[in-house]
Amino acid sequence: TFPAILLALLFSLMDCFYLALWLWFVAQTSLEWLFYCLEYLNILWLNIPADFYLFSGIGWITIIIIRIEFWRRFSFTIVIIITMLFSPIYKQPDYLWRVDMLDVGHGLAIVIHNGKSAILYDTGAKWEDSSAAEQVIIPFLQWHNLNVEGIIISHSHNDHIGGLSYLQQRYPNAWLMSSSTNLSNDYNCLADHNFYWKHLRFNVLWPTQLVSDPNNGDSCVIQITDGQFSVLLTGDLERKQEYDLVVKYKRNLHSTILQTPHHGSTTSSSYPFLNYVNPSNALTSASRYNPWRLPSNKITNRYKALNINYYITGKDGQISLFFYPTSWQQKTMRQDINPRWYHDWFGSLSFYE
């Protein structure tokens, strides 16, 4: 392709029009075949746990040591080095539990994990030939070597339920919880049907009844708490249902972290609701430059006026929360986990990059 393009440019400068035209045709044809092949090469991509790279590195180091007979003179040193390399594999995380809001574009996918077990809250969107589950959720789960024990669906809109069928194929033993009568639920999402998982309590706050096709107002609202810190998951809950929750639960709505209802739309995040939840941080799952212009500037300013720290996946990338015995920490992909190299020099930008 590249030689054909260079020759085409050269012959164009030499006024060899027909020869240049033929070379442009060759370059175009080669690119068409390349992209055709790339579509099928996608199946060869392997998503592997992070530990695999460590094992691979240890293997290569071992081969090099044997080949150069380094081990004969420094055997004790080699044993120490290999022991140090293996130590991260057996190191337990210092946090008790973790919540990740994945960057799935316009949609929602949240992973709650404790050790190597996980529960999913929503599964992102599905489109014609793929889904957020295939492109984002599965790679994340495999990278962290997580087993999905359960899936909670907030409601039936594609950007929340789209990846469900694919995830159920990959994790057939995972239980399902929703407020829909059209799904084969293992557990129904109904207010006050609370449950425990690991050391976490899942307080189910909404809805009060099951429906065949849950809409925004029927979103499965769950407050996850370890007794000290809590995360409130709201799906696409709207203003009317927020008022109902305020009337019923009042100060019990207070949570450390709030998943912003309905991607930061003006249909949600009412003042009374925010005052009672009173979170430290609010997390919004919304794509950059989406056609709905979410989150709304009006809502963003409302959170800021209430001194609530506001984060958006479209700007901050994946948002990760780590909960410890007496504290918690938040990290974002673009600022803390994997920042752009120039942020170290010039600092982070306040606008979309």
Model-based region annotation:
Residues A4, D100, I119, I152, ...:
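Hydrophobic/aromatic beta-strand patches that form the interior of the parallel beta-sheet core
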Residues A133, I137, S154, G162-L167, ...:
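Active-site-proximal loop/helix segments of hydrolase catalytic cores
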Residues D94-P139, W143-H144, N215-E238:
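Conserved beta-strand hairpin/beta-sheet module of binuclear metal-dependent hydrolase folds
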Residues T1-D100, V111, N281, R302-Y311, ...:
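Transmembrane helix-bundle segments that form internal channels/tunnels in multi-pass membrane proteins
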